[in-house]
Structures are given as structure tokens and as C-alpha cells.
From Swiss-Prot:
Enzyme class: hydrolase
Gene Ontology molecular function, alphabetical: 7S RNA binding; GTP binding; GTPase activity
Gene from which this protein is expressed: SRP-54B
This protein's name: Signal recognition particle subunit SRP54 2
EC number: 3.6.5.4
Taxon lineage: Eukaryota, Viridiplantae, Streptophyta, Embryophyta, Tracheophyta
Region (M-domain): 298-497
Keywords: Cytoplasm, Endoplasmic reticulum, GTP-binding, Hydrolase, Nucleotide-binding, Ribonucleoprotein, RNA-binding, Signal recognition particle
Subunit structure: Component of a signal recognition particle (SRP) complex that consists of a 7SL RNA molecule of 300 nucleotides and six protein subunits: SRP72, SRP68, SRP54, SRP19, SRP14 and SRP9.
GO BP terms: SRP-dependent cotranslational protein targeting to membrane
Catalyzed reaction equations: GTP + H2O = GDP + phosphate + H(+)
Keyword Iron-sulfur tagged: no
Family statement drawn from the similarity comment of this UniProt entry: Belongs to the GTP-binding SRP family. SRP54 subfamily.
GO cellular component: endoplasmic reticulum; signal recognition particle, endoplasmic reticulum targeting
Compartments, record wording: Cytoplasm; Endoplasmic reticulum
Length: 497
């Protein structure tokens, strides 16, 4: 069972409970038993599942709940809280300080440590964005081609690197590399080690020696989410050998069961700091347990959505966009810009899962590529339009001759141009419903949480989505998140210094 399916099963169990007339012990037990089965089938270890069930029953004591309490809501919150605890041990990972050398050592199972093509360059991109001066040391002398791969990734990312084609002692190479980069004032030195299994005693001893020699400030355990039921024992073996302080999970792209991931996090008692959701660099992201579980259960992650949006929309354009929103003005040029922003935000499936009431698996396999291709076709057609056409807010400007000219210029057929214009009309109608939002002219995102603005926005949302986020009160809460300007977590779970 993939993680997306796990989320669907848990949501289904909660929905069945919500449909019961009276919430009693039987209704609660039926719900928890279904969730338990789903977790076990997803390879979550039995002790972990049993502990979760026990904790929920301690929190939700139906006999002690006074009349008038929303039992359904309390049960849902308890389930959410316990799922978050599985992925968040409540510890903050080490946060490196700029201009002060910090050593980070990567360990993991054979076939995982820095072998996934997007892991090194993706992480380095995030590191450099935060103003660090990183360097890479290849202490993997076990795997053929390890140094070549690290060298290629480092060169591509313009990151200094150290390794040896002739040396066979990984401890010596690691120490030499760390010493060199400390002298060069690199403030984040990443040491890549060989992948290993708990059965390989010699490689575990090698890992311990590298750790003792380089004295890393942080040891990161890299794991593949498809590892399955052995995850708990493997992760515990690493934790018992070196001081694992953080976890990176790869292949969280929906093809693996993923439940072993929850077990491994519990075994290391260390926070997850990054997850890889695909094969590309934009599919590697900072991890936060609460938004992740919220998306898993179909409740979305509006703060994450807004953060992504703010990354792709230049700051100087944000007030202008909000002002046009408040006046209900929507042109093809605006639609073009928003399509571009959508593509820049990363995989549509991930963006889709951030919206309340939606889940990643609701976008069928293959549909994501089809949707992206359609957006690009629409943009190609708009590239064949004049400035007058792009800036007009009147769809009637497109007569037959203009439509034929656009079709010829973009290499598309007339029917496709008509389809694109119909989509524009639909979005224009939706945009018009939020006309009149107050206090947005100066880019004041917090104004979205005002009562009148929330009422205006509720007209745009589908009824099912509005219900999913908790009606008007839930919408106002989401709008407050959007306007809060909440900072992203620090690079390794802490804050930037």
C-alpha cells in the first residue's frame, strides 16, 4: 500500500465514523481498527501501531467527555497528533552556523547514500540558497564509480570536492578532506560514506571509525521509503553505531509502501529534515511533519502552498497581483503569468496535494503530464497573441479571424484555441467572484483573513472543498496562515543564525 493509499484508507475510516449517528466505544474501536490494519499493511511496525492506538484511547476517553464536546473533532485531532508524533520525535536537528565549519556525515543502506541522482545537487541548491559555503568529501571507497559520481555532481553545482582514485582507506580520505576544507573556510562540509547493511560488521566498524576521526556535528541517515518491514531494525542498527541526528527519505513518490519510513524514524528518534518525492531537483523538499500529515489526510497545506507561490512570484509583483485580485481584473496575460508560476512551483501532483480537500492520488497516474502539456499548449497559443489581446479583459475581442490567426501562429487547430478561450472565460468568472476584497491593494496578505474577505473567497471554493476545510471558520484559519508570513524552518530543523 503506497503512502497516498494509506492516507485514503485513514480518511475513509474517519469518514465512516463521522457518518455514525452516535459516537460510542464501538464507533471509536471500528475506526481505530481500520486505521491499524491500514498502517500494518503499509509496513509500519506492530509495536508502533499498538502504541499509537493506546495513546489515542488515552486522549479520547468518551466517558469523561462532557456533553456538548465535539467527539468527532477530538478523535480526528488525536489521530492527526499521533501520526505527526510518528514522524516527529519532538527534537530539533543540529542547525549549522555560517562562517563556522560544520561537518555533516551521510550514512545509509547500500544503494541509497547519495546514489540517487537528485539528492546531492538538490540538497546543495537548498544549502547555497541559505548562504552557506558547502564542500563535498567522498569517503566511499567501496562502491565503484562513487568518486566519479560525486565529482560530476559537485562540478555541475560548482561545489568544491575532495576524493581519491588511488586511496583505499576511507578514514584517511575523510580526515584529509575535512581538514582541507576547514582551512579553506568552508562552513558546511559533507562527508559521503559507503552504503551498508546491518549484517556487514566490517562496514559498520568503518563507519564508526570515520565518525570518530572526523567528529561530525550531524550524522544524517538516508533511507529509501520502499525498504519495507526491515526499516526498523536497519535504522536501529545505524543509531546504535553512530549518533544519527537527522533523517532524509528518498523515493516518496507514491510507488513504495512507505510505512517502513514511519518505523525507521521511530527507531532513530531523529527528525526527518528532507524528503525526495521524485527523480528531479524540484522534487526534493524541506520536510515538516504537520503539513505532510495534513496533506496525507487530504486537509492540504496552505502555508506551504503560499510559500511555494511566494518563491515563484517576484516580491515586486505580489502587491500588483493582489490589487488586480481585489478589482476582479483578469486578463490573458495574468492567466499566462499564473500558468508559468504553476509550472515553476514544481510537480502539479505535489501542488495539488497542498490544496484542502485534495490528495495527490486524486490526480490519476499519467494525468499530471497531460495537464502540464495542456498548460504549455495554452501558453504557446498565447505567445501568438498581440499585446492588445493579452491585456484585454473582454473575451468578445476574439472574433473568427483572430482565432484562426492564433491557431496558425501557434501550430494548433481552431478547436484547441476555442478550448483555451473557454478555460479563460471560466477563470474570468471565478476571478470575478472575489471582486471587492478589501485592503489588498498594498499587498497586505493578512487582510485575507478578514471576515468579509473570507466570505467573498468562500463563494469561489467548491462546496465539498469548503466542507473539507471546516466551513467558514476553517477558511478564516487558513487565510490567517496565508497572511502570517511564517518563516520556513531552518536548514536542519533549526533557524538560520
Amino acid at each position: 500500500m503506497v503512502l497516498a493509499e494509506l492516507g485514503g484508507r485513514i480518511m475513509s475510516a474517519i469518514q465512516k465514523m463521522n457518518n455514525v449517528t452516535i459516537i460510542d466505544e464501538k464507533a471509536l474501536n471500528d475506526c481505530l481498527n481500520e486505521i491499524t490494519r491500514a498502517l500494518l499493511q503499509s509496513d509500519v511496525s506492530f509495536p508502533l501501531v499498538k502504541e499509537m492506538q493506546t495513546n489515542i484511547k488515552k486522549i479520547v476517553n468518551l466517558e469523561d467527555l462532557a456533553a456538548g464536546h465535539n467527539k468527532r473533532r477530538i478523535i480526528e485531532q488525536a489521530i492527526f497528533s499521533e501520526l505527526c508524533k510518528m514522524l516527529d520525535p519532538g527534537k530539533s536537528a543540529f542547525a549549522p552556523k555560517k562562517a563556522k565549519p560544520s561537518v555533516v556525515m551521510f550514512v545509509g543502506l547500500q544503494g541509497e547514500v547519495l546514489e540517487k541522482p537528485q539528492l546531492v545537487p538538490s540538497m546543495l541548491i537548498i544549502i547555497r540558497r541559505k548562504g552557506y559555503k558547502p564542500a563535498l568529501v567522498c569517503a566511499d571507497t567501496f562502491r565503484a564509480g562513487a568518486f566519479d559520481q560525486l565529482k560530476q555532481n559537485a562540478t555541475k553545482s560548482k561545489i568544491p570536492y575532495y576524493g581519491s582514485y588511488t586511496g583505499s582507506d576511507p578514514v584517511k580520505i575523510a580526515v584529509e578532506g575535512v581538514d582541507r576544507f576547514k582551512k579553506e573556510n568552508c562552513d558546511l562540509i559533507i562527508v559521503d560514506t559507503s552504503g551498508r547493511h546491518k549484517q556487514q560488521a566490517s562496514l559498520f566498524e568503518e563507519m564508526r571509525q570515520i565518525s570518530e576521526a572526523t567528529k561530525p556535528d550531524l550524522v544524517i541517515f538516508v533511507m529509501d521509503s520502499s525498504i519495507g518491514q526491515t526499516a526498523f531494525e536497519q535504522a536501529r542498527a545505524f543509531k546504535q553505531t553512530v549518533a544519527v541526528g537527522a533523517v532524509i527519505i528518498t523515493k516518496m513518490d507514491g510507488h513504495a509502501k512507505g510505512g517502513g519510513t514511519l518505523s525507521a524514524v521511530a527507531a532513530t528518534k531523529s527528525p526527518v529534515i528532507f524528503i525526495g518525492t521524485g527523480e528531479h531537483m524540484d522534487e526534493f523538499e524541506v520536510f515538516d511533519a504537520k503539513p505532510f500529515v495534513s496533506r496525507l489526510l487530504g486537509n492540504g497545506d496552505m502555508s506551504g502552498f503560499v510559500n511555494k507561490l511566494q518563491e515563484v512570484v517576484p516580491k515586486d509583483q505580489q502587491p500588483e497581483l493582489l490589487e488586480m485580485l481585489s478589482h476582479g481584473k483578469f486578463t490573458l496575460r495574468i492567466m499566462y503569468d499564473q500558468f508559468q508560476n504553476m509550472l515553476n512551483m514544481g510537480p502539479l501532483k505535489e501542488v495539488f496535494s497542498m490544496l484542502p480537500g485534495m490528495r495527490a492520488e486524486m490526480m490519476p497516474e499519467g494525468h499530471e503530464k497531460e495537464s502540464q502539456a495542456k498548460i504549455k499548449r495554452y501558453m504557446t497559443m498565447m505567445d501568438s497573441m498581440t499585446n492588445e489581446e493579452l491585456d484585454s479583459s473582454n473575451p468578445k475581442v476574439f472574433n473568427e479571424s483572430r482565432i484562426m490567426r492564433i491557431a496558425r501562429g501557434s501550430g494548433r487547430i481552431v478547436r484547441e484555441v476555442m478550448e483555451m478561450l473557454e478555460e479563460y472565460k471560466r477563470l474570468t468568472t471565478m476571478w470575478g467572484k472575489v471582486k471587492g476584497l478589501k485592503n489588498l491593494e498594498k499587498g497586505n496578505m493578512s487582510a485575507l483573513s478578514k471576515n468579509k474577505n473570507s466570505q467573498q473567497l468562500s463563494k469561489v471554493l467548491p462546496a465539498q472543498m469548503l466542507k473539507q476545510i471546516g466551513g467558514m471558520s476553517g477558511l478564516q484559519s487558513l487565510m490567517k496562515q496565508m497572511g502570517s508570513g511564517k518563516d520556513l524552518m531552518g536548514m536542519f530543523g533549526g533557524r538560520d543564525e
